[in-house]
């Protein structure tokens, strides 16, 4: 059932780290989980042109630490750090609590090897009414130049304005979804076209993570 489950959630703690990292008592857990969701929604909406690949959230007492992996850090930081201050103020207004918010911006070096950024590129091209096969071919070519071992792209919906919705996919190389040690990057994006919504899924196989020998515990 490896193809049925979310590829990232399937590998948490093995080849993927948790996107949110904190502990809470059962009464606080739903509130904090909803806060995380609101934070991600706010950042993705207000920094849609910054090429956000991943958002990591950590909580320590009354402090929230955000790590933004982005293709365009200059857009996030802004001139003289003004963009960070605007983002921090917006998040404080959203949460409505006096919490310290620390934002760390990390630049993504290999843009064409990130599933989220490839998905974003495809949705932008689809919304400009470019033929989907040409977009997929271009995205795969760009990704292969970065030395990945495999990529799969699937687009679903009313492709090229067809009356009946369908799914089309293309794959190059290996994408072993059932291998737990395989480092799989996955993203799902939606393109809003004049014919309706198109769903875009991207899987990238970056190689296998071979675990080292376990350290022996001295008695």
From Swiss-Prot:
InterPro entries reported in the protein's UniProt record: KH_dom-like_a/b, KH_dom_type_2, KH_sf_prok-type, Ribosomal_S3_C_sf, Ribosomal_uS3_bac-typ, Ribosomal_uS3_C, Ribosomal_uS3_CS
Coiled-coil ranges (or none): none
Disulphide bridges, residue numbers: none
Compartments, as annotated in UniProt: Plastid, Cyanelle
A biological-process GO annotation: translation
Record key words, sorted: Cyanelle, Plastid, Ribonucleoprotein, Ribosomal protein, RNA-binding, rRNA-binding
GO cellular component: cyanelle; cytosolic small ribosomal subunit
GO molecular function, one term: rRNA binding
Residues covered by the KH type-2 domain: 39-109
Pfam families in alphabetical order: KH_2, Ribosomal_S3_C
Family matches, as CDD domains: KH-II_30S_S3
Binding partners and assembly: Part of the 30S ribosomal subunit.
Protein name as catalogued: Small ribosomal subunit protein uS3c
Species this chain originates from: Cyanophora paradoxa
Gene: rps3
């Amino acid at each position: 059932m490896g193809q049925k489950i979310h590829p990232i959630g399937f590998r948490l703690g093995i080849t993927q780290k948790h996107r949110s990292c904190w502990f809470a008592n059962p009464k606080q857990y739903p509130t904090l989980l909803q806060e995380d969701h609101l934070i991600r929604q706010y950042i993705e909406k207000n920094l849609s042109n910054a090429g956000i690949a991943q958002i990591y959230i950590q909580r320590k007492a009354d402090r929230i630490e955000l790590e933004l992996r982005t293709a365009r850090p200059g857009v996030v930081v802004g001139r003289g750090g003004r963009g960070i201050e605007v983002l921090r103020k917006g998040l404080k207004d959203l949460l409505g609590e006096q919490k310290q918010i620390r934002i760390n911006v990390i630049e993504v070096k290999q843009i064409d090897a990130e599933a989220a950024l490839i998905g974003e590129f495809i949705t932008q091209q689809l919304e400009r009414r470019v033929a989907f096969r040409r977009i997929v071919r271009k995205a795969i070519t760009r990704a292969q130049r970065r030395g990945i071992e495999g990529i799969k792209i699937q687009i679903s919906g009313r492709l090229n304005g067809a009356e009946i919705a369908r799914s089309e996919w293309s794959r190059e190389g290996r994408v072993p979804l059932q291998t737990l040690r395989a480092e799989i990057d996955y993203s799902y994006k939606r393109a809003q076209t004049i014919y309706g919504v198109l769903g875009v899924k991207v899987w990238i196989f970056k190689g296998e993570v071979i675990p080292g020998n376990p350290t022996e515990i001295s008695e």
